[in-house]
Amino acid sequence: MIKLKHNIEVTPKIGCSNVCEYCPQSTLIKRYKERIGSDKDTMMTLETFKKCLSTLPKHVGLNFTGYVEPFLNPETPDMLLYAYEQGYSILLNTTLMGLKKSDWMKIKDINFRELHIHLASGSF
């Protein structure tokens, strides 16, 4: 397992329907609404992701594990592929909820630094 000195969490969407026991969704959503407003979009676009990535050095690892199921944002597979093609090291933490077969075909050859698949505790 590769340990990077610098990592940044990528949260491609605010709000998650998995309701995992360890995840503070209510706190996250409350803070988001306080700071950003409730009328703002909760999905990160691929274009916004690319803009953010253009300011980030390549030695910084990307962790797609920021209090959301990443695949609830339909652009996440394209974000993952773009980041990988740009040379970033990627950690993905997912329940696979929202992932379609066509999405899997896009990302199946990505050499993830770490790939964690877990069950959503709220789904039992």
Annotate each predicted stretch with a short phrase.
Residues N93, S123-F124:
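Short acidic, glycine/proline-enriched helix-loop-strand junctions
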Residues M1-E114:
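Conserved alpha-helical substructure of the radical SAM core
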